[in-house]
Amino acid sequence: MIQLMKQFILLVLFSVSLLGCKDTRPKDGKFHIVTTTSMITNLVQNIGGEKVAVQGLMGAGVDPHLYKASEGDVSKLSNANMIIYSGLHLEGKLVEVFEKMKRQKIKTIAVSDALDKKELIGSTLFASNYDPHIWFDVKNWEQITIYVEKQLSEALPEHKEYFKANAAIYLEKLKVLKQEIEAEIATLPEDKRRLVTAHDAFNYFGKAYKFDVVGLQGLSTATEAGVQDVQKTATYIIDHKVKAVFIESSVPRRTVEALQAAVNSKNHEVVIGGTLFSDALGNPGTPEGTYIGMFKFNVHTIVNALK
C-alpha cells in the first residue's frame, strides 16, 4: 500500500512538472523569432524566409536607445523560440529583459557578437563600451548575415540548406550594394566628406567611406545636446565650410534646427540636407523599409547635399 502511494505521488509530481514546462513551439508549428530593431527584422526575414515567423518590436522612426518594453512586448519575448537583438547597449533599456529571457532558457542572441572587438569603434566616454551602430559598414552586415544564418541553422538543422541558400542570395545583394554606394561616394571629393548629424550614429560609415563625422549628441540619444555642443559644432561647420547638416528619422529635429540657427547667426549659411535613417529603417513596403534601400537612400541624400 505504501509503495502504491509513493508511485501515485511521483506520478502526480511528474504530471505537475509537465504542466509547468513551457512549450517553446507555438501551436501554429512555426519557429517564432522576436527581433528588436527594424534592421535586424529585415535581415532575419531575408534569411529565415517562410521557415520562421519574425516579429519585430521596433518599427519605423523608433529610437532603440530610448525604447522600453511594454507588457505586450514581454509577452512576445516570453513566447518566442529565439530572440535576436543588436547588442553593445543599443537597446539599453531592454538589457534586464534580455537577461530574464535567458534565465527562462530562451535562446537570446546579440548580432554584435558576430564581430571581432578589434573591428568595433570604442566609445570616447567609456573605455569598456563600443559604438553600437555597427550596421553602417556593409562589411559588418555581411559578417552578421553569416552569423544569423549559422544561428538559425543550429536551431533548425532540418532547414539549414534553405537558410544557407537565402544567406548566399542576400550576401550577393550586399556585394552589389557595396559597389553601388562606393561608386556614388567616389563622386564626392574627400574634402567635402564632412557629415554632421543629430547624434553620433555614423562613425562606422565614416570609417568605411572616409567621412569626417560629427554628431550633436553622443552615441546614445538618451542625453540631450547642450548649448556648448551646439556652439562647438557650429564652429566646426563654419571652419570647414560645411554646406549641409542632416536630421534623423528617429531623433527629434529641434537640435539640428537650433544648430542651423546658430550657424546662420554667424553669417554662414548651412542648409538641412535631408532626413537620414539612422537607428531605424523607413516604413514597411517602401524601398527605405529595407536595409539595402535605406543605405542607398542615405548615401544618395548625403552625396547630393554635400556636393
Predicted regions and their residues:
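Extracytoplasmic metal-acquisition and chelation regions
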Residues: 21-307
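Sec-dependent signal peptide recognition
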Residues: 5-12
